[in-house]
From Swiss-Prot:
<comment type="pathway">
    <text>Metabolic intermediate biosynthesis; chorismate biosynthesis; chorismate from D-erythrose 4-phosphate and phosphoenolpyruvate: step 7/7.</text>
</comment>
<dbReference type="Pfam" id="PF01264">
    <property type="entry name" value="Chorismate_synt"/>
</dbReference>
<comment type="subunit">
    <text>Homotetramer.</text>
</comment>
<keyword id="KW-0274">FAD</keyword>
<protein>
    <recommendedName>
        <fullName>Chorismate synthase</fullName>
        <ecNumber>4.2.3.5</ecNumber>
    </recommendedName>
</protein>
<feature type="region of interest" description="Disordered">
    <location>
        <begin position="272"/>
        <end position="296"/>
    </location>
</feature>
<keyword id="KW-0288">FMN</keyword>
<keyword id="KW-0521">NADP</keyword>
<dbReference type="InterPro" id="IPR035904">
    <property type="entry name" value="Chorismate_synth_AroC_sf"/>
</dbReference>
<feature type="binding site">
    <location>
        <position position="46"/>
    </location>
    <ligand>
        <name>NADP(+)</name>
    </ligand>
</feature>
<dbReference type="GO" id="GO:0005829">
    <property type="term" value="C:cytosol"/>
</dbReference>
<dbReference type="InterPro" id="IPR000453">
    <property type="entry name" value="Chorismate_synth"/>
</dbReference>
<keyword id="KW-0028">Amino-acid biosynthesis</keyword>
<feature type="compositionally biased region" description="Basic and acidic residues">
    <location>
        <begin position="272"/>
        <end position="283"/>
    </location>
</feature>
<keyword id="KW-0285">Flavoprotein</keyword>
<comment type="similarity">
    <text>Belongs to the chorismate synthase family.</text>
</comment>
<feature type="binding site">
    <location>
        <position position="341"/>
    </location>
    <ligand>
        <name>FMN</name>
    </ligand>
</feature>
């Protein structure tokens, strides 16, 4: 089974991603990972950290000469700011006098509404929010994006598919309602400052960000992930835990600041009558044809051959420049929340992280379905299955 885990803190020496269960022969280089991490830093409305944050990638194990070996994969994403934080974030004990001289070490006792600070301090018995925010930070997603580069490579080599995303809306901007982008559109989407697939939508999003910036506020938004060309039958209806839509929803909800997920037309489908909610089928020369994809490529917890389409809603960033009302945990008195440098909007980057999680989950489901210890073996198993499906539909 494909499994992944990350370790590390936002201002620690490095983030680490571990990926277990990936087959041998997946073609991935350090440069490929760096490319995906650079995409994660994209986006209009990002903060100052993105200007000097550089992700130094080191593949520690599981890869030789650009190909996976079949064993556990470890990737380290170094923190270029580590020298500034070496004393404060040291894993080993530090002399109290040394810490006292560090302005950055001042206790953070005013939790931010909407962040993990308050609950984390109480749950783990911390008097300071620093240990909470360091791990809860969205910086952790860099490690997930690194791990997912292998899943993306696997899906590309076995199925010939690409995972892409685009921003549907930011704040109250006019939502995009046009056709689904394809893999050939990814470069154009990444070239957009807000990763939009439409110029009018892009302009509306930028206007929203500029207005929030002037007001000392932050914005959320909606992203969509699309994969064209997946085979029928990834996932299962056998149990709730095996349903691919449930697994995708869990993975996307596990991204920092994501508060909602929908598959296909999702919540809009609930407003329709059954006759207008489903994707009718008719025979075609090469199989079943559908004129709509309201289900988002998933029926009964399984892929149905149509484009996989899922959306995630990101809340506004909880580190608000004008600061929200809170309580100082050291005194119990009213206070304003702590404010560290932050983005006005990180929705474009959230799309790249959402791609990563979808890639990992779909690769996991594909390995469960087709098995194998190498890319060649998995691809051969898939080809046999695809031939059988095609023969059955041709009857």
């Amino acid at each position: 089974m494909l499994r992944w885990i990350t370790a590390g803190e936002s201002h620690g020496p490095a983030l680490v991603a571990m990926l277990e269960g990936m087959v041998a022969g997946v073609e991935v280089t350090s440069e490929d990972i760096s490319t995906q991490l650079a995409r994660r830093r994209l986006g209009y409305g990002r903060g100052a950290r993105m200007k000097f944050e550089a992700d130094k990638v080191t593949i520690v194990g599981g890869v030789r000469h650009g190909r996976t070996l079949g064993g556990p994969i470890a990737v380290e994403v170094g923190n270029t700011e580590w020298p500034k934080w070496e004393t404060i974030m040291s894993a080993d004990p530090v002399d109290a006098d040394l810490l006292a001289d560090q302005a950055r070490n001042a206790p953070l006792t005013r939790p931010r509404p909407g962040h993990a600070d308050y609950s984390g301090m109480l749950k783990y018995g911390f008097d300071d929010a620093r240990p909470v925010l360091e791990r809860a930070s969205a910086r952790e997603t860099a490690a997930r994006v690194a791990a997912a580069t292998f899943a993306r490579g696997f899906l590309r080599q076995v199925f010939g598919v690409e995972v892409l995303s685009h921003v549907i809306s930011i704040g109250a901007s006019d939502p995009y309602a046009g056709p689904e982008p394809t893999a050939s559109d990814l470069a154009a989407i990444d070239a957009s400052p807000v990763r939009a697939f439409d110029k009018a939508a892009e302009e509306s999003m930028i206007a929203e960000i500029e207005a929030a910036k002037r007001d000392g506020d932050t914005l959320g938004g909606i992203v969509e992930v699309v994969i064209h060309g997946l085979p029928v039958g990834l996932g299962s209806f056998i149990s709730g835990a095996d349903r691919l839509d449930a697994r995708l929803a869990s993975a996307l909800m596990g991204i920092q600041a994501i508060k909602g997920v929908e598959v296909g037309d999702g919540f809009e489908t609930a407003r329709r009558r059954g006759s207008q909610a489903h994707d009718e089928m008719r025979p075609g020369p090469d199989g079943i044809l559908r004129s709509t994809n309201r289900a988002g490529g998933l029926e009964g917890g399984m892929t149905n051959g149509e484009a996989l389409r899922v959306r995630a809603a990101m809340k506004p960033i909880s580190t608000v420049p004008r600061a929200l009302a809170t309580v100082d945990m050291s005194t119990g008195e009213e206070a304003v929340a702590i404010h560290q440098r932050s983005d006005v909007c990180a929705v474009p980057a959230a799309g790249v992280v959402a791609e990563a999680m979808v890639a990992l989950v779909v690769a996991q489901a594909a390995l469960e379905k087709f098995g194998g210890d190498s890319v060649a073996e998995t691809a051969a198993n898939y080809e046999r299955y695809a031939s059988g499906v095609a023969a059955r539909l041709a009857r």
